[in-house]
Amino acid sequence: DRSVSRGLGDVYKRQVLGDGMADEPIEAAGGKTPLQLADKPVMDEMAKVSEQGIAYTVPSNLPAGSDVANLSMLGYDPQVYYSGRSPLEALSIGVDMKDTDIALRCNVVTVSEDEDYEDKTIIDHSAGEITSEEAAILIEAVRKELEDDEYKFYPGVSYRHLTIWDHGEVVELVPPHDVLGQKIGQYLPKQEKLKEMMKKSFDILDHHPINEARAKRGLNKANSIWFWGAGTKPALDDFKEKTGMNGAMVSAVDLLKGIAVGANMRNLDVEGANGGLDTNYHGKAMAAVEALLEKNDDFAYIHVEAPDEMLSLIHISEPTRH
């Protein structure tokens, strides 16, 4: 979080958030965190000359996730403003929720081929970071078979999609990245319709041409949907009115873009920014610089999703690359 003078007495602020970067010590890595293991000379030099501190961004009674933490970092007390992850993503996609709607994250995931759905193991919560183009076709196939007056499906980015449940309820659902490598039976929704749709989705997706082609290329199939992150319609205060600053958001993921929409911040679209390890880092940085120097923005929030993605997959060597 840095403030920089840019002439004429104006001060501009930029904040860089490496989502999930610190993480917890890992026994297999000698008790070090991924951030301790990473080759990050520029960050190390900045730390030597910077004011350092600890921020508690996640209240103990709320789920530890990107939604709660990023709201906190932007100055929105999650005890007041948090209504679930998916409703924020709905804002980004452009879905106008009713007060009686419940939003659900609808991942496309990779599960094993065991005959009984409840005996299947969740292999990959991101289906190999499937492309948005492939995933949109799969979500459309699911929509044609499962959508009705009560449930509507909307495509998002990569493996992250949205389901709106008309007159639904906020049910307890397990994030798929929390149960990687485990049999899914005990983690399925208790709500029967949600569970039944997940089961049916496997039959719809497993032999879909998109997945057959992915399998031939040695890629994980996106052969099931997975519901989680339920929540109600959000209501965020205007960022300018709250902080006195015009804000710009640089992020590839719908969660952060949705926060920006709700807070009336400006979303900056960056070509090649995909929320993965090989995102366009330079493009994101330059978009923030341009916003501060050439546009009417006083604050830029640069969100980097790659650490969170890699750590969710428990690849210790991968997040140390950047």
Residue ranges and their predicted role:
Residues 1-12, 314-322:
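Single conserved hydrophobic/aromatic residue that forms the stacking wall/gate
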Residues 14-16:
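Residue-level marker for buried hydrophobic side chains located in beta-strands
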Residues 22-139, 143:
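Active-site nucleophile/metal-coordination loop of metallo-enzymes that catalyze phosphate/sulfate
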Residues 41, 46, 218, 308-313, ...:
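A long, amphipathic alpha-helix that forms part
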Residues 113-122, 166-183, 288-313, 317:
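Active-site His/acidic residue clusters
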Residues 126-224, 230-232:
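Glycine-rich, mobile lid/loop segments that gate access to catalytic sites or pores
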Residues 232-313:
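Anion-binding catalytic surfaces of enzymes that hydrolyze or transfer phosphate/sulfate esters
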